[in-house]
Every structure is written in structure tokens, then in C-alpha cells.
Amino acid sequence: MQVPSPSVREAASMYGTAVAVFLVILVAALQGSAPAESPFPFHIPLDPEGTLELSWNISYAQETIYFQLLVRELKAGVLFGMSDRGELENADLVVLWTDRDGAYFGDAWSDQKGQVHLDSQQDYQLLRAQRTPEGLYLLFKRPFGTCDPNDYLIEDGTVHLVYGFLEEPLRSLESINTSGLHTGLQRVQLLKPSIPKPALPADTRTMEIRAPDVLIPGQQTTYWCYVTELPDGFPRHHIVMYEPIVTEGNEALVHHMEVFQCAAEFETIPHFSGPCDSKMKPQRLNFCRHVLAAWALGAKAFYYPEEAGLAFGGPGSSRFLRLEVHYHNPLVITGRRDSSGIRLYYTAALRRFDAGIMELGLAYTPVMAIPPQETAFVLTGYCTDKCTQLALPASGIHIFASQLHTHLTGRKVVTVLARDGRETEIVNRDNHYSPHFQEIRMLKKVVSVQPGDVLITSCTYNTEDRRLATVGGFGILEEMCVNYVHYYPQTQLELCKSAVDPGFLHKYFRLVNRFNSEEVCTCPQASVPEQFASVPWNSFNREVLKALYGFAPISMHCNRSSAVRFQGEWNRQPLPEIVSRLEEPTPHCPASQAQSPAGPTVLNISGGKG
């Protein structure tokens, strides 16, 4: 390392010693969270060209992430970091930059105008810089939380990673403005759970559900649907694991994939391979909604608990499967063919329990709505104590995975378990949720739900760009608030959701009419969306709607797998009484690290190690 000033020389000397120590203890520090064959088990391409590739591992004991960034073609430097929604403004960054004299690595941040500043608290610590035939490798680490106001708090949910390329040497770091750079974003879950892999049964077999040599369309976004079928007479099996198969060279284009089983009520489903929004798509494909497997960029293999498996095949189960592949092609690359898909691992030796999937949250109904121009409007759905008392077995159920779901305006989703009126634990939470990144996530800890418990699912929405109210429903411009929880043992309870009582919503429309000069159409022939569309969205009408959702009785959907409600009275039910709420977690501030550099690290990246 070449050091241009005494202050930086002193920091670099201390730091050089620390680097040697870190490299010796790195594998030990990560032991238990990485397979023996790789200290960096998680990988994603950051940019469509494959110039930047990120690998990482997690030390939960140290509350630290170790990153390895491969820069295949380095010009004058790169930016990498995180931000709330993937913007380059107000971003937490680490920057490799060059001037006429040398190269530097430093912790930085950007302000609301995209101007980059060196961070006074250097929380990204460089451990190694090495040139190889593949490119430049940068190994560095970062605590989950730093308590630095300019830093991003790394949490369990979605993280929006950002990157940018520097084309020419700089006079100084402060001369960077992100608005003039070639930049991009990638979404990923960084904090993967550290769960031991269960052993697979001796009779495990595999089945590949793959796209049939698809010519990826030359457009930015494509959802491709492909229908295939199980062999005739395929008996009942348990899926015990699945993993992605991504065609080599397409790693940056295949964004996520799902395998759905079709409804058993149809004896046949027409074969189809084409865009999911094609007018040629058979209508029956809309009834292929039962999720067997789901994968998103950055995820690895999904294992079921040793005591449970997901049943498919046999009597009462459809032979037809639908593969859906989301191609993300921002550079509009043409001529690329793809056969990506999902490999299912299954066994004929059925495990003790069938795994089930239950829907929590809000019913798909327009009575739940978000006013326009809202930055953080919250809607909440309930799975009530009355429903769980009636529908769950005496021994309860065990939730081991979860898939959160909203449409385009969703920003946060959380499901909380409450018992005896007190919130006790988080089932799943994503404070940076994106509707463009949905995956089934293993829970770090299995959540046990007992009869009489309450499951509360809340979604936060942003409708700043909308002129009319956004109502609940199936359409992509309508909204949902759902948590698909994966659990065992399977029960008859498939859907446990709520919505405000329609009669109380009608009272809201009458109240709006009484206190506003503009008349809201409440005539019998007017639909709920039409009535919401005629509401003048002043502060009074917004606050009253918010209050209504917070106290009005609810209509409960406590449904069997046959879509029929369990016997009982489910309309005009009181909201569950919650007397104690969980406190928001307080970020842990790591102790001041004497080995952290006081300023940027100076590198020699012409070859060898820095």
C-alpha cells in the first residue's frame, strides 16, 4: 500500500495488521454458517452484463456480513451499497475510486441530491483486494447495524442493493454525483437463516420442471408460463427439497421462478408455453395457483423440516403443473435462449406430517382501500382467536416458512402472533418489501401457533403516484395483503383472513356525504370502487377512514380447503383485543473498533494483493 499522508499512513499501518488477523480468522468466524466447500455460499450477479458479482456470508455471532465483490472490468472505480428502495440518493455506499496518483477504498454516503460524501465513521472494512485473471476481488465486512445516521440498517427482509460505475479518474470522492453515473439495483435477502440441512431420504428422486428452450423476449419484463404434467398414475409423494436450475449465462436475466399445481377439479389443462399475459393463454391456467416451489434471485435450495413434506400426486391431486419464470431484461438483450426451472426432490416414503399452506391477511375485497397520495397507509387483516380455536388441532401447528405478497403499492409487510391479548413474536417481517421480489423464506425460528392464538398481518402502502383510491382485489392495480405461511401438520384451515364489515363502510360513505359539499354516490347500483372513486380525499375523510379500519367490526373468512367457511357466525366480529404490543427492535450498536481506519484505505491494484 502507498500512503500519501502521515494521518492515513498511521491508520493504514494499524489496518494492515488487522487485515492479516482477519484473514487468518475469517473461516473460523464464519464456521457454522457456510458449507465447507465455500466461505461465501451466497452469490448474485449485480448488473445484467455480469461485470459485478457479489458473494457473501453471515456471522450471526459477530452480527457482521462478509462481502466479496468481483469487478470483472474495472475502469476508474465502482460504487456498491444499499438504500431504502433502490435509489442512489440517500444511499449507504462503499466506493473504490482512483485519481491520478492511486486507488482508494472508503465508506461513503450520498445525500438527497446524489452528491457523494466520505463517511466520518468507516464501517465498511476492507480485508483484501486481489487481482486475478477473472478480475478484481474486494473482500470487506460490515456490521448489521452501525448507529451511524448515514448508514443503512441491515435487517432480515429484502435489501435493495445499488451499484454504479466510475468511467474516469476523479479529483476527489466529493466530485461524484450519482445522477451522472451508469447505475442499477438488485434486490436480495442478505440475512439468510443459518439452518442445518436435513438429511434426504435414501429413496429420494428428482424431477425437473424447466422452460422448454424459451427464446427470451427482447423486452424489459416478461412472465413466461409453461404447462407440463406428471406421469399417468403418479402416486402420492412428499416433496422434501427443491433448488433452482438456471441456464448458464442467464444468471442475471432469470429473476424468479415458481411452480404451481393446477386445481384438481379440471381433468385436463391445455398445454401452453408463452407469455403469461398472452391473449392465447388458456383461461384454465388461472386455476393453477397452488404453490409447490418458489425461488428468487440469491436464494439457495429450500429444505422441508425432517418431519414434514409437501404432498403431490395421487388421488385428488391434479397431474398438471404450471411453471412461471420472470425474466428481467433491462438491456433488452435479444437472441438468448433459456431452459431454467426448478428441480424437485421427492420421496415415496411419506413423512410423519403433510406440510400445508395457509393464507393470512386481508380478504380480496374492495372494502379495504388506500386513499391516493399516501406515503405510508397501513391496512391490517386478522386470523382471529375464534377461528384458530375452532380449526387448529389441540397440539397446534408449526410455521417454518413464509411468503409475503402485495401488489404494486406495498412497501412493508409484517405478521405478528398474539396470545392471551399480548403480542408475543414476529412470524415474518419485511421493512423494505418489494412486490418485484417475492420468495418463500425459511424462518430463523419455527413459530408454534396454538388454538386461540391470533395472527395479525399488516401491510404498509405508498400511493403517492395515484390519483384515485386503490381498492383491494385481484387486479394488478388493485391491492392485496397476504402472508402465505408454510406449516405442519396440515389442517383443513386454508384461509384465515378478514375485511371491514361492509355495513360499517356504508356508514362511512354516508358520513362523508354529510360533512362534504361534494356528494359521494351511495346509490344501490354504485359499486364500492365507484363510491371510493367519488370521495374527495381531504384530511378529514382520510383520517376517518383510517379510524374506521381501526375500530369497526370485521367479516372473518375462516375457510376450509373447499373454500367453505367453518361453521359459525363470522360477520360483524369484534376486532381482537390486544393489550400489549411488541416494541420495535432497537438496533445494536457495535463497540467502537480501534482497528477501523480513520479514512479511506489506499490500494495498489495494479496486480497481486493490496
Curated annotation (Swiss-Prot):
Co-factor note (free text): Binds 2 copper ions per subunit.
Single Gene Ontology MF annotation: dopamine beta-monooxygenase activity
InterPro entries from the UniProt entry: Cu2_ascorb_mOase-like_C, Cu2_ascorb_mOase_CS-1, Cu2_ascorb_mOase_CS-2, Cu2_ascorb_mOase_N, Cu2_ascorb_mOase_N_sf, Cu2_monoox_C, DBH-like, DOH_DOMON
Pathway(s) where this gene product acts: Catecholamine biosynthesis; (R)-noradrenaline biosynthesis; (R)-noradrenaline from dopamine: step 1/1
Catalytic activity, EC: 1.14.17.1
Cofactor: Cu(2+)
UniProt-listed Pfam families: Cu2_monoox_C, Cu2_monooxygen, DOMON
Protein name in the entry: Dopamine beta-hydroxylase
Protein species of origin: Bos taurus
Gene: DBH
